[in-house]
């Protein structure tokens, strides 16, 4: 691509969006290069990038081009193509959703759009419920406010496969961003019926499905637990509070500054419940209210973070691995106790999620399926079970990045479901005088102590992308040890491994049942390492983890 030429073409043609026009005029040479050195990558996660002007940015033109490519793909595969569209609280999410709707309608693709911002699982749900050809969610999940994205779902409600993504990308690449995109006015589309708002009955059906995930099976528990909940200025407020209230959890307090949708995320620059800073304000509220449980969901409400009081009365954050283990053990224990465990029960987790989950699953007679990083691969396994007539065999799926799903009604992680099930689990144990931290220690005593950590390293721009590739190649060299722990085996998923799709992921199995996974993020300019350490106690595990981390970081210099 001739960067200067493309920049001048945008100056001449990208005149419909005032923000794009203004930004184009202010770009210096370095910013022009970063904005135009490539087209924004489209993959199984759809699009994700910084909001702004250029081919490597999220804007009305790149969104329209992607929508045109998706429309062309759908018309080839469906006689009467249709799509569900949802959007979150991010900057320009509603604008991008309406642009996409206009393009689909102009191409004869029937549009069903949520009338207000909604959590991402409702798009997966509505796609299945309304039997549409695809779903689109405008979101960048938990990224900083400068990002937005465009997530695509197949007719099964699962994020698109690698093959579908490649086909859609091929359609997108045929297009000129200005000459080949059919656009349509959103309001005109609504008026002529090409665009329809999704009725409230679909939202109610979603909430009912979440409520049906309860595994109390008639047991009475104390639902008067004091809860503080924050949607982190995202989409979770209405569906989470409605579900909790309808299930009897009425003693709930909101984090006022984080309740209302706000794409600038004024109280937490990184609205990710995995990050302590994002939970800080909620923890302040929890202390003031003397709450029993703090819950927070990310902006598109597919992840849940929690904090609970320890014996000293201080609030302690639980990791995604810890919460997932607790939920798995609780759900399985309840199903076994009440005779509700399905035939050939299955638990699905990602390869970077702690292996103790598999031990717990085995204890309860569940078969574990390990998949690549990304909840779409968990959703894909649910689909395979459904094709075999065994959808009910799916008991639980989770990933270390705070994503959980207890049923097959959607094919993506669900923060509404996660928040409700965590409340139910908490109240169940509280009724018996047991804290979640007590239960966690019990699991460690049964299965052994395990520490799991995630480290992220940013590499911005075109130079950063090249550096990440070089680092991955260095890791593929003859690595003997990490932090004094010898490499027992290297699992390289690039050529495909254990029947899994090809993926740029390395997993080093180390001695003493330790491991480290290295992979580039699929949605951000980051390299991630996942370290797992087994030891006799927390202190010993932390020492080993620090040394493994130091060794890994030598390759990042």
Which stretches of residues belong to each language-model region?
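Phosphate/diphosphate-binding loops
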Residues: 115-178, 272-296, 325-331, 346-357, ...
């Amino acid at each position: 691509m001739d960067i200067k030429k493309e920049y001048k073409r945008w100056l001449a043609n990208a005149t419909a969006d005032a923000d794009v026009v203004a930004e184009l005029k202010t770009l210096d040479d370095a910013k022009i290069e970063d904005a135009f050195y490539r087209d924004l990558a489209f993959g199984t996660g759809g699009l994700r990038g910084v909001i702004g002007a250029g081919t490597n940015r999220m804007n009305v033109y790149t969104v329209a081009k992607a929508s045109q490519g998706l429309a062309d793909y759908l018309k080839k595969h469906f006689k009467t193509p249709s799509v569900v569209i949802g959007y979150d609280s991010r900057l320009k999410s509603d604008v991008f959703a309406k642009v996409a709707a206009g393009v689909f309608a102009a191409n004869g693709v029937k549009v069903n759009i949520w009338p207000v911002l909604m959590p991402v699982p409702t798009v997966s749900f509505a796609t299945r419920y309304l039997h549409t050809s695809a779903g689109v969610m405008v979101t960048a999940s938990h990224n900083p406010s400068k990002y937005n994205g465009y997530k695509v779902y197949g007719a099964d409600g699962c994020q698109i496969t690698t093959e579908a993504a490649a086909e859609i990308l091929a359609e997108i690449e045929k297009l000129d961003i200005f000459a080949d995109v059919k656009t349509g006015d959103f309001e005109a589309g609504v008026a002529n019926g090409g665009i329809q708002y999704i009725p409230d009955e679909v939202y109610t059906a979603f909430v009912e499905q979440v409520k049906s995930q309860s595994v109390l099976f008639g047991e009475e528990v104390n639902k008067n637990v004091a809860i503080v909940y924050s949607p982190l200025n995202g989409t979770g407020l209405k569906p989470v509070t409605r579900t909790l209230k309808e299930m009897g959890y009425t003693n709930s307090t909101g984090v006022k500054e984080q309740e209302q949708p706000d794409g600038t995320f004024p109280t937490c620059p990184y609205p990710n419940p995995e990050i302590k800073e994002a939970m800080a304000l909620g923890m302040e509220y929890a202390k003031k209210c003397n709450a029993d449980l703090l819950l927070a969901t990310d902006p598109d409400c597919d992840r849940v973070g929690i904090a609970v009081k320890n014996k000293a009365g201080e609030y302690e954050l639980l990791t995604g691995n810890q919460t997932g283990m607790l939920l798995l053990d609780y759900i399985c224990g309840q199903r076994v106790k009440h005779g509700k465990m399905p035939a050939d029960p299955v638990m699905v987790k990602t390869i970077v999620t702690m292996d103790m989950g598999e031990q717990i699953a085995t204890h309860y007679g569940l078969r574990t399926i390990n998949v690549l990083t990304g909840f779409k691969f968990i959703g894909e396994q649910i689909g395979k079970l459904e094709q075999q007539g065994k959808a009910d065999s799916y008991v639980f799926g989770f990933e270390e990045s705070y994503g959980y799903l207890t049923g097959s009604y959607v094919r993506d992680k669900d923060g509404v479901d996660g928040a409700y099930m965590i409340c139910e689990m908490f109240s169940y144990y509280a009724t018996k005088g047991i804290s979640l931290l007590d239960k966690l220690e019990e699991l460690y005593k049964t299965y052994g102590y395990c520490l799991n950590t995630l480290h992220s390293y940013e590499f911005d721009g075109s130079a950063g992308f090249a550096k990440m590739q070089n680092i991955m190649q260095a890791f593929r060299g003859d690595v003997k040890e990490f932090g004094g722990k010898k490499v027992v085996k290297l699992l390289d998923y690039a050529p495909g491994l254990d029947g899994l799709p090809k993926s740029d992921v390395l997993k080093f199995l180390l001695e003493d049942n330790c491991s480290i996974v290295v992979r580039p993020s699929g949605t951000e300019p980051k390299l991630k390492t996942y370290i797992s350490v087994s030891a006799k106690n927390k202190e010993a595990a932390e020492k080993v983890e620090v040394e493994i981390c130091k060794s890994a970081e030598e390759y990042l210099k």
